[in-house]
Structures are given as structure tokens and as C-alpha cells.
Amino acid sequence: DPIAPVRREIERWRNHFGDLDAAAETLADELRMGSGDLYGAIAERLRVTHQLSIRILPVDVMPVALRRLDLHARQLQLSELLDPASRTFAAAFQLGQIEAIGEIDSLVKGGSFTERASERLYRRHLNSYFAAALMMPYRRFVRACEATGYDVELLQRRFGAGFEQVAHRLTTLQRARGLPFFMIRIDRAGQSSKRYAGASASPLVEAEGRCPLWALHSAFDRPGRLVRQLVELDDGRRWFMLARTVSPQGGRIGQVRAQFSVGI
């Protein structure tokens, strides 16, 4: 299983990669000095510094892919199906592949993976981590969390991010007073596709046979709405949980789209 060693390496770092955060913060400060529009600033950086333009293509031209790098045309091609948060993330992901390559290469080598598949998955996780850190720079994000009382929906609006992007970012706050969060993503069958304990050490991340009354499951009955729940375990410990459904980007109008529940 190529995923298992990747999960072990992420948990070894408690899903906090300080070098990537530092690089993303520095770059975010540079980009925001000239523009309040992060997507526009990233696009300008790609164009001026790396000779890559961003082109939004209709679904008829990109019927399957949501993101494609065309080096011959020097274009990062994005599907029109991507919402603004996903477009910014895709642009930040591409910029990270170029400007954070040193930090990412070092972390991948330190993982000592025996399979190339695991190495590729880990590299993708680190690239995604950098993209999220560029959209939600560490210190600025922690201050916003404290100022808003960790209001996830307000954080989404403030940083132009999606619910799942904010949820994942919350699991990375292992320094500077960040509260310990975990994150789980499941499908309707209860199969998990993302599990991050972060600094929480929550047993809920590894729990098998999860209760159907759990907010993570009941969120499917209230799609798009935030479900809140206080969970008490057999040992007396209690965990406050938020859950909401999310759907992956893509798919034409009328098509059945996969749905997941994300809980923190």
C-alpha cells in the first residue's frame, strides 16, 4: 500500500512543515505588497518571473482534466469548472512546484520511501501544503483564527478558501498557539480518504465502526450546512466536532457528483 508510508511520514511531522510555512509566508508577503488580489498576484508572478501564463479553458476543451501544464505553450491551463478558491489553489500549487522545489525535495528525500508511488503521493501532499500556506499564511491565519474564535465560515471568506482547504489548514497549526485540530474526510459508505491527527492525538482519526449518529455521517442529510456535535468517548474525553459536506470540483451541470463529508 503506497499510502500507508505517506501517512506515517505526515504524522511523524504532525502535518506541520515549518520550512514550507516559512517559504510560503515570505512569498505571500512579497505578493501582497503589490496587490490585494492573491490570484492576480500569483498569475503575475508566474507570467513575469517564470514565463507561464494562466488560461481558463471551456469544459469542451478540457472535458476531464481540471488543471494542465502545457510547457510548449508556456501555459497553466485551468478548467472553467473550477471555482475562485480552486483556481487560486491551482495557481499557488504550480508556483510552489517551481519556487519551493528545494524545500520539497529535501522533505521527500528525508522520507526515505522505498516506492516511487509513495514518493509521488508525498510530494503532491507537500505541494498542496505549500499552496494552502500561500493562501493562508501561518501567522496571519493564526491571528485570524484567534480574532474570529475559529469561525470556519468566516475564515473561508477572509482568505478566499474552501471549507476543506480551511479544515486541512487548521490541522497544521503546531506552533504559535494554534489549537490542536484533526481532520477526517469520508464518503457515504464511511470509507475515509483523508485522515490527519495533527497535534490533536485524537483517537477519532483512527476509530473504526464509527457511529452513524456521528456528525460526520449526519452531515450527508444536511448537504452544504455546518453540523456541530459534542462527542464523548468511553474514557470520558470530549471532542467538539464540526462537519460539512463537500463535492469535488468538476462535472457538468446535471451530472451526479461525488460527495464527501469533512469533519474537524
Descriptions of predicted regions:
Residues 1-264:
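Short juxta-domain linker segments that transition from a proline/glycine-rich
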